[in-house]
Amino acid sequence: TLIIKNYQFALYYGASSIKKYDTLYNYALPFLKRKRYKVLQGQNSNFTHKGNFSRYAIDFKMNVGQTVCAIRDGVVIQVKDKFTEGGRDKSYRDKANLIIIYHEDGTFAQYVHLKKDGVLVKKGDSVKKHQPIGYSGNTGMSTQPHLHFAVYKPSENGLVSIPFILNSIPTEKYKKGKYAKNK
């Protein structure tokens, strides 16, 4: 964000004109096969998954250092890998290590709270579905080690989280306390 003489401008990724995207695409779980992780927070939940940006996000409880994988083929457009700390306070909101990947249908996936030096890809890299891209952590606004991830489409007001199908299961089925297993 750039502020000039009381005017504020913001730059967002993607084409805000995107109307259709592949709503039936079956995304892979963001972790290795034969692993299972507990859902800490599902869509539209009280703590941080409210509003347009995070409504359909899912948090998986993952100890620091667990392998995070791409949920779909795409191109890495943003990486943050320098932060070491995390906490509940909003002052940590912009201090999360993350990866954002662009998909061919105009959507994006965001993988957040990665550990410092835990990113295996760089901006501009092409990635394949199931490819390891980083390691889970506890950076940014986070109360415990986990992976926060969501799928987005661009809008005139920035990225908006969208419902999606993950491992043949719609996002609304990923409820707090349930487990997701990657077979």
Language-model segments: residues:
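A structural signal for short beta-strand/turn segments enriched in small hydrophobics and glycine
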Residues: 68, 74-76, 121-136
